[in-house]
Regions:
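A short, contiguous, amphipathic alpha-helix enriched in charged residues
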Residues: 17-35, 39, 120-134, 163-166, ...
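Active-site phosphate-binding and catalytic loops of NTP-dependent enzymes
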Residues: 88-93, 131-141, 214-218
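Charged, low-complexity intrinsically disordered tails
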Residues: 11-14, 20-27, 39-41, 50-54, ...
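Short beta-strands and strand-coil junctions in structured, solvent-facing domains, enriched
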Residues: 53, 62-63, 87-90, 153, ...
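Conserved inter-motif catalytic segment of the P-loop NTP-binding fold
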Residues: 117-138, 148-150, 156-159
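Conserved glycine-centered short motifs in functionally critical loops
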Residues: 141-315
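Mixed-charge (acidic/basic) macromolecular-recognition segments
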Residues: 95-98, 136, 152, 189
Length: 316
């Protein structure tokens, strides 16, 4: 039976849904973020008369969108709310977190609270999803999926050497797996190869429908140009969006994870690209030392890729 596991890392919590040794889905959360289902209080600071939407302010000064307000809600009142969507950074804009009055919202289940905590996720499990999101590409027999996070939608292009119908059908399973691996939501556009005949397009629609039967969403049928649009609940930034808008932060957290997973005595030598230095917060470095019981030395190498940080043990 599939089971959610959670690893509480340094600067990041990571959850994966495992079925045996297969990863079915993955999620991550950065401490301090508002998340769907979270209960909060906010002061209503702006609301137009007769409207049901407004702006709230948290105790720490952050702003949040509030929907489904009672029409008689007054500015200045403190309201109990349930978060429906975390904040999402996009190229060129920032989507504020969103919430509803607690009595008007259906709380989302919190995987991070219900998952079974483990000290370490199985080797390679998180790395597979992270590497795929980092590269924005997933290869499969006969083709590849190319992912692009844009303000309008997440765009997925399918390319390959197979005939159009065979290529589209071969892409369905890796595509539907990626949706869960990256924790994608919102508007998703899939550019399949153009399939001229209706029976061919129908076969792809049916295959896609079967593969996504247990994943809540709405979608269009494939049009004559091979385009399919999916709309799913958006609860926060996907792993793909984090790579697009907070790549340094994501890479810094992965660098710390690699250092933490090394076993043995000595001193931890963590080698990173210079751009990551400022992202390794002092409290994170201290936590790494506490968890490993080893001193930490950080050195930079401009020849390294941002994502290619590596750790090793050296003699003290």
């Amino acid at each position: 039976m599939p089971e959610w596991l959670v690893e509480h890392g340094i600067g990041e919590d990571r959850a994966v849904l495992m079925d045996g040794d297969r990863v079915l889905a993955a999620k991550c959360r950065w401490p301090g973020e508002l998340y769907a289902g979270q209960s909060i209080d906010a002061k209503l600071v702006r609301k137009e008369a007769g409207k049901t939407r407004g702006l709230g302010e948290l105790a720490d000064g952050r702003t949040i969108l509030i929907d489904r307000l009672p029409r008689n809600a007054q500015e200045g009142a403190t309201l109990p709310l349930t978060v429906t969507r975390g904040a999402i950074a996009e190229r060129g804009r920032y989507k504020l977190p969103a919430a509803r009055p607690a009595d008007m919202a259906t709380p989302a289940s919190d995987v991070f609270a219900s998952a079974r905590p483990v000290r370490r996720l199985p080797q390679g499990v998180w790395e597979d999803a992270w590497d795929a999101a980092s590269s924005g590409e997933i290869a499969f027999a006969g083709g590849s999926l190319l992912f692009s996070a844009t303000p309008a939608m997440t765009q997925i292009d399918i390319d390959g050497t197979l005939p159009p119908r065979e290529l589209a059908l071969a892409a369905v399973m890796p595509l539907t797996r990626a949706l869960r691996w990256f924790d994608l939501g919102g508007s998703i556009g899939i550019d399949f190869p153009t399939i001229a005949d209706k029976p061919g397009r129908r076969a792809v629609d049916e295959s896609l429908g079967a593969a996504l039967a247990d994943w809540p969403h709405e979608r269009t049928a494939m049009n004559g140009f091979g385009f399919v649009q999916i709309v799913a609940r958006l609860e926060g930034p996907s792993l793909l969006h984090r790579m697009a808008t907070a790549r340094l932060g994501a890479a810094a957290r992965m660098a710390l994870r690699r250092a933490e997973r090394i076993d043995g005595a000595g001193e931890t030598l963590l080698t990173i690209h210079p751009a990551l230095s400022a992202k390794l917060r002092p409290e994170w470095r201290e936590e790494l030392v506490r968890r490993t019981g080893r001193p930490l030395q950080v050195q930079t190498d401009p020849a390294l890729a941002i994502e290619a940080a590596h750790a090793q043990l050296v003699s003290r």
